[in-house]
């Protein structure tokens, strides 16, 4: 089995703008098949910044944000299902579109808005210029085997870069910072010092 180099080409807005991988296998009928996400990508420590949000996507998110904060806000929470004997399922592996959709739809709580937004995000995905970056996020997330939801995982991975955020898009910065201001009190800290 012969592997060629995993190549990265950078640009001004992100360290990784394009990802190309060439795998060469011997021409046997039983040649091994290897997907990109099965490779050991632990050497990729610097994920690219979240791509600049396109004007179409900004408008879409603004519309759904307005719907979610308006009249429909009474139906925000779905009824809770009984989880008495809940079996832990193996997490579904993400692809680039699932990562993209998960990141941009996470702040919409209304179920009907979520469903419609998901369909509209599928259309936006077809026009997305940075599909490879979202695919890279998904590959790294799958490889990490994290128990965190994708959006939270991405936020944690990119939190080191928040201080030196270079994107010219304040919407993206705001998306990352939405949950970064939550303070959790450690109630066990005092108890452990007493014993």
UniProtKB/Swiss-Prot annotation:
Alphabetically ordered keywords of this record: DNA-binding, Nucleus, Transcription, Transcription regulation
Subcellular location(s) per record: Nucleus
GO molecular function list: DNA binding, bending; sequence-specific DNA binding
InterPro entries: ALPHA1_Saccharomycetales, MATalpha_HMGbox
Any Pfam family matching the protein: MATalpha_HMGbox
DNA-binding region: 89-145
Entry GO terms, CC: nucleus
Any GO BP annotation: positive regulation of mating-type specific transcription, DNA-templated
Note: In P.angusta, all mating-type proteins (MATA1, MATALPHA1 and MATALPHA2) are encoded on one idiomorph, consistent with the fact that P.angusta is a homothallic haploid in which any strain can mate with any other strain.
Family designation: Belongs to the MATALPHA1 family.
Function: Mating type proteins are sequence specific DNA-binding proteins that act as master switches in yeast differentiation by controlling gene expression in a cell type-specific fashion.
Protein name per the record: Mating-type protein ALPHA1
Species lineage: Eukaryota, Fungi, Dikarya, Ascomycota, Saccharomycotina
């Amino acid at each position: 089995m012969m592997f060629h180099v995993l190549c990265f080409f950078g640009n001004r807005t992100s360290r990784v703008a394009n990802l190309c991988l060439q795998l060469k296998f011997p021409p046997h009928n039983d040649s091994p098949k290897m997907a990109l996400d099965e490779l050991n990508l632990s050497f990729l420590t610097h994920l690219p910044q979240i791509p600049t949000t396109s004007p179409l996507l900004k408008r879409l998110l603004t519309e759904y944000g307005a719907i979610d904060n308006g009249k429909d806000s009474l139906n925000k929470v779905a009824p809770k299902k009984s989880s008495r004997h809940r079996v832990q399922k193996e997490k579904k592996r993400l692809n680039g579109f699932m990562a993209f959709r998960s990141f941009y739809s996470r702040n919409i709580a209304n179920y009907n808005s979520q469903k419609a937004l998901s369909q509209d995000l599928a259309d936006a995905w077809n026009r997305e210029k940075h599909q490879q970056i979202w695919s890279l996020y998904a590959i790294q997330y799958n490889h990490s085997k994290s128990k965190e939801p994708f959006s939270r995982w991405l936020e944690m991975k990119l939190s080191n870069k928040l201080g030196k955020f270079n994107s010219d898009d304040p919407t993206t910065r705001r998306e990352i910072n939405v949950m970064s201001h939550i303070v959790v009190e450690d109630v066990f800290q005092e108890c452990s010092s007493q014993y």
